[in-house]
């Protein structure tokens, strides 16, 4: 027995000795691979060919296009809840309703997240304006957001004031108190010779694929003049605080692509910026009036005909330190190695107060909710976690998504240069460097819908060249439902920027314009009737496919290099000692203290 045991022991030792080189080789192989394996998967080489699950495409298309519930969500949100101004009771109601609906459809971890203090809560209860003399006329008007109340109906003589620069204020000292002031020049109302409702044609979509070598300077000019206009508005507000008129009437602006007449009023401005902060509060009631009504009073006054106005602005303030909240919910990942990684989608839930915020951005909200419903209905088991974010505070400065990103992923410090501190926070330049959190490496992408009710025609790549061949393959089976276009261009002004700013792939879809810029954007006409059912069904279907693809791939989506705004000044500085024969300019010695 002992001899047999010795033989067995000897054999075992021999096997171990034979195995040692193999084990050592495996160990060396693991060690040599570990630096590569330690990298986030978005840094690894991407496959040339995407694994497309055509069965999943078809299942999502069938559920999204044949069994949609998107319009039911739309009616409940727009008709049942209504306007959703940040800080208002309605936006709180919408936060809670979306949370409960997402939980009811099968999402997990449905909750609200506080993104911080916003400012004053406010509601418009009722507003009406009429001309009492020289004729009776009922006018179209609404209170500017965060306007104080008139505390009952008032009657006053109309006075038009023309203030284009600081010194113009002096002309009206001692004249505005007790009057109803018309503030703003009468703009030209041109014929609407182009359709207010438009879809992209093939030529326009092809034009979108061209990358402009020089950025358009229109917005730069706007920014350059903005500090002057902000300072002027502040001085006008101070003037009205010192010599208070009964109320101020402002004309509705024009639409970006036409429109802004025919009873449509764009109600997204007041007397100053950040008027939801107590320190910037408007000193007197302010309303925005239809351009045709404003024009009649303007012409009468300029013909020296006295005009008497009656009006009542009934508004309610609800506190100076209201907080903003985002609605968050998930479909949990199931792959043990990938479930901690996240694919996000979202839209902003808040709106302006003049209507029910249907196209801006109830449409994006209900499309995002429908995406989650589709995936839950199909009992999709994503490898990565799919997370929805419905943001508030977008209309005032993209606060909700920026707050969420700062809490979870990182943030970019803003410039504190004197000229920058004069601007609203959402317009200040990033100063850097980025401050990132560990979660930033765990999110694959964020997909956003916020361009109205139009169907999806493609996607803005935000200059992410590595993503182009991937998305090109994703949209190939979607061309029959209108998705054809990828553009390297950036687009801005909405929540994907919060993610893009900290190095996370953030995307906004290209959507048909419809009447978004001409009739509904921030207007009193932004109601359920402006929603296009087939377009919303298509948008939810397309986004569900994008989200599913991102959640099921082996790797996270590739990223652009991290932004370094702190290096911008250095990178843009003129080259030194470049010109032959140029003499050095002596540096001025520092003054002695």
Model feature map: region roles:
Residues 67-91, 99-105, 109, 173-175, ...:
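Catalytic-core environment of secreted peptidases
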Residues 218-230, 237, 241-242, 247, ...:
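Active-site-adjacent substrate-binding region
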Residues 56, 140, 146-171, 272-358, ...:
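Soluble metallo-hydrolase cores and metallopeptidase-like ectodomains found primarily
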Residues 48-88, 261, 350, 448-454, ...:
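N-terminal capping segment at the start of a domain
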Residues 57-65, 79-90, 127, 145, ...:
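Second-shell loop/turn segments in exported
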Residues 134-137, 151-156, 174, 178, ...:
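Metal-dependent peptidase/peptidase-like ectodomains
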Residues 29-56, 75, 79-215, 416:
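Noncatalytic luminal/extracellular "stalk/propeptide" segments of secretory-pathway proteins
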Residues 10-20:
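Bacterial N-terminal signal peptides
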């Amino acid at each position: 027995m002992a001899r047999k045991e010795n033989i067995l022991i000897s054999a075992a030792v021999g096997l171990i000795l034979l195995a040692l080189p193999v084990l050592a080789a495996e160990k060396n192989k693991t060690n040599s691979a570990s630096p590569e394996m330690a990298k986030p998967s978005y840094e690894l080489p991407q496959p040339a060919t995407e694994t497309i699950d055509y069965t999943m495409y078809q299942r999502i298309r069938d559920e999204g296009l044949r069994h949609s519930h998107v319009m039911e969500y739309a009616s409940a949100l727009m008709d049942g809840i209504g306007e959703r101004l940040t800080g208002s009771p309605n936006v709180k109601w919408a936060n809670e309703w979306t949370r409960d609906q997402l939980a009811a459809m099968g999402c997990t971890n449905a909750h609200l997240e506080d993104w911080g203090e916003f400012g004053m809560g406010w509601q418009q209860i009722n507003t009406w304006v009429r001309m009492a003399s020289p004729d009776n006329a009922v006018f179209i008007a609404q209170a500017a957001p965060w306007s104080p109340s008139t505390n009952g109906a008032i009657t006053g003589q109309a006075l038009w004031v023309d203030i284009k620069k600081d010194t113009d204020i002096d002309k009206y000292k001692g004249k505005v108190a007790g009057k109803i002031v018309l503030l703003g020049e009468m703009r030209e109302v041109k014929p609407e010779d182009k359709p207010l409702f438009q879809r992209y044609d093939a030529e326009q979509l092809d034009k979108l694929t061209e990358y402009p070598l020089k950025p358009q300077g229109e917005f730069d000019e706007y920014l350059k003049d903005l500090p002057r206009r902000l300072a002027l508005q502040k001085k006008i507000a101070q003037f009205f605080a010192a010599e208070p008129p009964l109320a101020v009437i402002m004309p509705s602006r024009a639409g970006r692509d036409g429109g802004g007449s025919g009873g449509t009023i764009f109600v997204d401005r007041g007397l100053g910026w950040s008027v939801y902060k107590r320190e910037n509060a408007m000193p007197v009631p302010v309303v925005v009036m239809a351009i045709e009504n404003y024009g009649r009073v303007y012409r009468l006054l300029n013909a020296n005909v006295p005009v008497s106005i009656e009006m009542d602005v009934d508004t309610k303030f609800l506190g100076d330190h209201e907080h903003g909240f985002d609605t968050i919910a998930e479909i949990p990942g199931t792959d043990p190695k990938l479930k901690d990684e996240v694919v996000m989608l979202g839209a902003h839930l808040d709106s302006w107060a003049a209507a029910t915020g249907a196209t801006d951005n109830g449409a994006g909200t209900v499309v995002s909710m429908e995406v989650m419903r589709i995936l839950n209905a199909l009992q999709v088991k994503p490898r990565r976690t799919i997370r929805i974010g419905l943001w508030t505070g977008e209309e005032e400065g993209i606060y909700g998504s920026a707050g969420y990103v700062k809490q979870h992923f990182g943030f970019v410090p803003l410039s504190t240069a004197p000229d920058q501190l004069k601007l609203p926070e959402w317009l200040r330049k990033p100063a850097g460097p980025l401050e990132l959190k560990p979660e930033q490496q765990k999110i694959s992408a964020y997909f956003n819908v916020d361009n109205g009710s139009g169907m999806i025609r493609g996607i803005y790549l935000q200059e992410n060249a590595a993503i182009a061949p991937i998305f090109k393959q994703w949209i190939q089976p979607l061309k029959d439902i209108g998705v054809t276009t990828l553009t390297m261009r950036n687009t801005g002004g909405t929540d994907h920027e919060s993610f893009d700013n900290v190095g996370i792939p953030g995307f906004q879809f290209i959507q048909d314009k419809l009447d978004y810029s001409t009739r509904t954007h921030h207007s009193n006409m932004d109601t359920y009737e402006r929603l296009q059912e087939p377009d919303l069904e298509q948008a939810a279907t397309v986004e569900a496919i994008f989200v599913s693809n991102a959640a099921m791939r082996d790797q996270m989506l590739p990223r652009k290099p991290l932004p370094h705004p702190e290096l911008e000044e250095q990178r843009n500085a003129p080259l030194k000692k470049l010109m032959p024969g140029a003499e050095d300019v002596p540096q001025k010695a520092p003054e002695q203290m």
